């Protein structure tokens, strides 16, 4: 079966030109855990062929309930390596670069899209600020998916106007503290559901996966809008 057949259902909606735009698009994704891993898979399954994934974590047993790279067999392995192997089984012709490192404020190379799915407030803040400095690169970010049950409460909004999300609030507070703000508006995925506190930071796949798939849809819809 030729490779085009695998993406025929995507092309039915996006059209031949839309598929070509998706194949030519370059995306960098920071964080491949409970949100980012599902975003990566959704993009590759839709037809994206140029993806760079960045994460310095290894798979842990506590990841198995929600993270795509996590199985009993992959515990202890770098998440980006496991995910790259999986994505290449979906499309062996895809150019997938795996960077086993945490973001520490470095300058960013230009991509068409940057997706932020990291948890650290400091790293997330620095990434958003630096990413919005890169001309022509669209930036999408994930806010807090943990401590929630309801996938139907997942929505999107602009970072500075999101309410009821502790992570968005913490990011804005750090921006104010360091005196730096995004150079342009940043569209985010978040949940309107009130967080449910628990002793450990609980999270469920049905919510984190919807966050990830929403991020992927933001990329695809942006390409459609730009057409």
What are these regions (language model features)?
Residues 1-27:
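N-terminal charged helix/coil linker that caps or initiates catalytic domains
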Residues 35:
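Hydrophobic/small residue at the entry helix of a nucleotide-binding pocket
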Residues 48, 53-90:
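Glycine-rich phosphate-binding loop and adjoining beta1-alpha1-beta2 segment
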Residues 29-31, 54:
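Conserved N-terminal Rossmann-fold NAD(P)-binding element of oxidoreductases
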Residues 109-113, 118-126, 130, 139, ...:
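Glycine-rich phosphate/adenylate-binding loop
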Residues 39-40, 83, 215:
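Hydrophobic residues within alpha-helices
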Residues 99-105:
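Conserved SAM/SAH-binding loop
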Residues 45-50, 133-136:
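Conserved S-adenosyl-L-methionine
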């Amino acid at each position: 079966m030729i490779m085009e057949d695998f993406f025929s259902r995507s092309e039915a909606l996006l059209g031949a030109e839309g598929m070509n735009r998706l194949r030519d698009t370059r995306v960098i994704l920071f964080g491949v855990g409970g949100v980012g891993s599902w975003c990566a898979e959704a993009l590759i399954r839709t037809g994206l062929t140029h993806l760079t994934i960045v994460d310095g974590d290894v798979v842990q047993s506590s990841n198995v309930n929600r993270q795509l790279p996590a199985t009993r067999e992959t515990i202890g392995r770098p998440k980006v390596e496991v995910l790259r192997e999986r994505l290449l089984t979906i499309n062996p012709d895809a150019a997938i670069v795996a960077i086993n490192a945490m973001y520490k404020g470095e300058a960013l190379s230009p991509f068409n899209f940057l997706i932020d799915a990291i948890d650290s407030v400091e790293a997330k803040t620095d990434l958003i600020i630096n990413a919005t400095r890169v001309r022509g690169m669209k930036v999408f970010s994930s806010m807090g998916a943990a401590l929630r049950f309801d996938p139907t409460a997942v929505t999107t909004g602009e970072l500075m106007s999101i309410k009821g999300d502790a992570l968005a609030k913490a990011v804005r507070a750090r921006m104010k503290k360091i005196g730096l703000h995004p150079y342009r508006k940043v569209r985010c995925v978040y949940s309107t559901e009130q967080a449910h506190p628990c002793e450990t930071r609980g999270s469920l796949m049905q919510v984190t996966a919807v966050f990830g798939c929403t991020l992927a849809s933001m990329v695809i819809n942006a390409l459609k809008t730009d057409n």
